[in-house]
Every structure is written in C-alpha cells, then in structure tokens.
Amino acid sequence: MAIKRGADLIVEALEEYGTEQVVGFIGHTSHFVADAFSKSHLGKRVINPATELGGAWMVNGYNYVKDRSAAVGAWHCVGNLLLHAAMQEARTGRIPAVHIGLNSDGRLAGRSEAAQQVPWQSFTPIARSTQRVERLDKVGEAIHEAFRVAEGHPAGPAYVDIPFDLTADQIDDKALVPRGATRAKSVLHAPNEDVREAAAQLVAAKNPVILAGGGVARSGGSEALLKLAEMVGVPVVTTSTGAGVFPETHALAMGSAGFCGWKSANDMMAAADFVLVLGSRLSDWGIAQGYITKMPKFVHVDTDPAVLGTFYFPLLSVVADAKTFMEQLIEVLPGTSGFKAVRYQERENFRQATEFRAAWDGWVREQESGDGMPASMFRAMAEVRKVQRPEDIIVTDIGNHTLPMFGGAILQRPRRLVTSMAEGILGCGFPMALGAQLAEPNSRVFLGTGDGALYYHFNEFRVAVEHKLPVITMVFTNESYGANWTLMNHQFGQNNWTEFMNPDWVGIAKAFGAYGESVRETGDIAGALQRAIDSGKPALIEIPVSKTQGLASDPVGGVGPNLLLKGREIPVDTGGSMYPGENLLHLKS
C-alpha cells in the first residue's frame, strides 16, 4: 500500500492505457498533474502548446494517424472552453481522443458564477462520454471508462472533468487504478444471409463500385479490400478518411470521392448501378452527398448502426466490421451464381474505369505543367510526390488548396492524408501536422495551408522548433480566403470580408528558429522542398498562388460554383401561424 495524490492516480491510469503522448496546458488547476507527469516516464512525452485549441488539434492529428487514443489532453480549467471545435471534429470524424479537464475547486461547484468553474456539461453534446469525478477513489475508474468509449465503435472524444482539489488530495492507492484491462476487439460478423445477398448483388451488377471508408482503415482491412476488388474486378472509390486503404497506383483505384475528391471517383460513383459501402458514414466529405451524388442501390456495412439509413436508404443495412465482412464475402463469392473467376483486366467494366482514371490523370498533369507565376498548387504537389515516400504524411488545411492537396497526393497506405475531414474547420492544418509528426517521427510530414488558415496557429512554430518537429509547411499566399473570394464574386460581384494583408511569413518562421524560404519562380519549388528537407528543421515555404485555382473554381469535385445556395421564395405569413414551421410546407424551389 501507498498513499498517493489524485494527480499521481491520473498519471498511473493514463500509463495503464498505453498513453504515448501528453498535450497539456499549465494553470493553477493543473499544477499537481504537471508535477506528477514530471515524475513519470511520460514526463519526456509532454507537449505544452501555445494554445489549448492548438493542442487539441495536435491530439487529433496524433490519434488519427495512430487510430487510437495514444495522445491525451490535460487542460487547465478555463482553457477547456477552447477545446470544443477540435472535439467536435473528433466526434464526427471518429477520432479517438481522451481529454482530462482540470476544473476549479470542487467545493465551489454550484455557487452562483463561482470563479473559473468550467461548465463541464457543455461537452455533453460533443463528447461521446462526459464524466464529472467527485470522489478521489473514482479517478481511475472514470479514466478507464473514457478510454473504453473513445476507442469504441464509433470512436470519438471522451471528456473527464476532475476538480483540481482532488489532484492534491491523498488516498491509499490500493485497487484504485484498474489493472490488466484489455481493449475490446471489434470483430463483428455479418449474418450469413446478408453476406450471400451482398455477394449476389455484387456479381449481378453491370457496373459495381466498392466505396471504402475510414472503417476499412480502422479494421485493418486493406489486404482484404485488395483481394476482394481483384477477385470480383470492381473499381474502388474511397472516402476522404479511407484514402490510401487501397493503393492509389492500382489500376482499379479511382481515388477519393467528394467535393474535394478526384473526378475519376465522382464519375465512377455517378455511373455505378450498385455500390458496396464499407465503413463509411456517407458524409459530404466522403461522397459530397449535398452536392453531386445520387446513390444507386447499395449495401451499407458499418459497425455503427446509427449511420445506416440516415441519409440514403440502402438495399441492405449490415452492422459488421469492414474487414470481417470482406473476408466473409471472399469466402462465399466463388459459390455465388454468375460469379466468374477471371482476371479483373478482362471484366467488362474495367475499360470504363481506366478511361475515367486516365482522364483525371491527364487533367492533373495539365494543372501541373505550367511554369508561370502565381504558381499552380497542383505543381507544388507534383514536386512533393518526387520526394514523398510511402510512409510520409500529407496534411492539408481547409480552402481552395484542399482540392490540389487531395488530388495531387498519391497514397499507398491508410491514414497518410490528414485534415478536418468531418467538419472542414479552418486552421486545423498546422497543429494536426505537428500531431502527426509526433506520432510518426520517422515519416516526413508535408503540410499545405492557405495564408488565411495559417493565421490561426502559426504561434505553434514554437512547439515545432522546441521539439524538433521537421514539418514542411507550404503556405499558399494570395492575401485572401480564396474559396470565398471566388464564390462571393461569382454570386454577388464583390468580395466583402475575403481579403486581408499578410505579414512576412518567412521572417516569422525564421524568428522562431525554423527554416524559411519564399518561392518566386515555379521552377524553384523543387529546390525549396529539398533545402527544407536537408535543413532538418521545421520549415516554411511561401508559394504565391492565384485566388481562383482550387476548390471553388475547378469543377472536378462536382462543386465549383455549385457550392452556392440558391435562395427560395418564402410566402409572407400575413395572418399569423398557429404552428411553427407551417410555411415550410409552401416553400418554392
């Protein structure tokens, strides 16, 4: 037996669940926890970000790459109020993340406007689990529950609120931290009749497509996906979170779909007469449901029953693990009526797939070919590909540049493309890139960001330099929120709220001790990238670009000006209405 502080129990519980990285912010409520970390093996694995929001994005970047809550946040009371945006991304993007919120003295709870009492209930709509710990002997149990929920299905954020007086209190530690708990393995088998029905639909379709989402990556299903696609000769489209689960150099790879996706993928989805959806929420980022995609008949497979049939109505809904379902499918396909064991290159739909992919590849090459300035962002990505290795990670922020970053990256592995995939939150890129670099120190991390996005978190260059995180940041500058500049001009003939002045980005990077360089000729991009790599430092490369290239102008994702919402004519309610929303019945398209 030993007498231990609550802070020590918190650290021991995090160690028990395999925490690799701690991102924490100091304040009076986190003093005891900071001291406890310094005395543990995690003391050398603590990052103190410039802001709590930047730190929460680092946690997301780390855990997205690792596919578990390997990084944990520990935050000083009022700083917790900055976490919500990153936690919302973790929820809808299915990123496992445990956050420890250290609140003010618990004896003040419930008093009218007590100083610095964080309303922990504000996390309830966002986190998949929100707990308030009010007894010291419950600390370990609460953290155990947080990991169980965060790494479950669906994955997401879990928040544990602990009053800081408990971190200073002492108690006999016997049996207070659950020991030997194992993570549940999600191996959900589908009913045999559902597997046979899916196999029959796949074989009978003239132009089938497999849509592979992030659930395929999380299940470790890349090998099964490759075997299934080649066995049936079915082209593979991925969602944004599924990018890389199928090697994008393969002849059956159509790339990622959606409004930031590849045109070959969107064309393939539009031409399909049947889609096998594996491990996807069917969200806007995954397939651009709000803009372009009308689904044919499809079978929807996911571990989360809550996402089945919520937007589209599938022919068959299956609650199953993506990898397990594919393995079941591979087993029954040879006995399915109409199945032919022939090379995928000989199947009828292969020619159409190659035509779509060739057209897309040709278009991308055209975008990469120009030598003029402002530079093409596709050209920048072409130069990145020359130095990119299979293990390297591409991170993009949100804006016009997102399309060239998605379209220019050719991935061989899952979880190599990182951004705010679920919510599209501006400013996520730089801290997520730092988190990804922390998670995989032997990988190169290339970030593409707009100047507007970089304004959010450029202060985290301190973390990059202090911890020797050699992220290579390409900041595409045009002194505007380019996507909105284009759309505002298209719709209203003016660009209010979209332009701003830039600082000396290269000078700022150098002031922090990072490498910095400004590109003034397109032909200099390759050399700048190599010099950044050779420096071994965090690096910033400024690349001037136009305001119009990318998401809002190029229709390859089926979007472009289609992002604009046409107003509807709503009749005036002159007599009043007894029922809220009554006039919605009379809306005109």
Swiss-Prot record:
Sequence segments annotated as region (Thiamine pyrophosphate binding): 400-480
Catalytic function, reaction form: cyclohexan-1,2-dione + H2O = 6-oxohexanoate + H(+)
Gene Ontology CC annotations of this record: acetolactate synthase complex
GO-annotated biological processes: isoleucine biosynthetic process; L-valine biosynthetic process
InterPro entries xrefs: DHS-like_NAD/FAD-binding_dom (IPR029035), THDP-binding (IPR029061), Thiamin_PyroP_enz_cen_dom (IPR012000), Thiamin_PyroP_enz_TPP-bd_dom (IPR012001), TPP_enz (IPR045229), TPP_enzyme_TPP-bd (IPR011766)
Cofactor(s) the record lists: Mg(2+); thiamine diphosphate; FAD
The entry's keywords: FAD, Flavoprotein, Hydrolase, Magnesium, Metal-binding, Thiamine pyrophosphate
Disulfide-linked positions: none
Enzyme class: hydrolase
Chain residues that bind Mg(2+): D451, N478
Enzyme Commission number(s): 3.7.1.11
Note on cofactor: Binds 1 Mg(2+) ion per subunit. Binds 1 thiamine pyrophosphate per subunit.
Gene3D superfamilies to which the protein is assigned, alphabetical: 3.40.50.970, TPP-binding domain
A Pfam cross-reference name: TPP_enzyme_C
MF-aspect GO terms: acetolactate synthase activity; flavin adenine dinucleotide binding; hydrolase activity; magnesium ion binding; thiamine pyrophosphate binding
Binding site for thiamine diphosphate: E52
The protein's assembly and partners: Homodimer.
Task of the protein: Catalyzes the ring-opening cleavage of the alicyclic alcohol cyclohexane-1,2-dione.
Family per record: Belongs to the TPP enzyme family.
Name the UniProt record assigns to this protein: Cyclohexane-1,2-dione hydrolase
Organism the protein comes from: Azoarcus sp
Lineage, opening ranks: Bacteria, Pseudomonadati, Pseudomonadota, Betaproteobacteria, Rhodocyclales
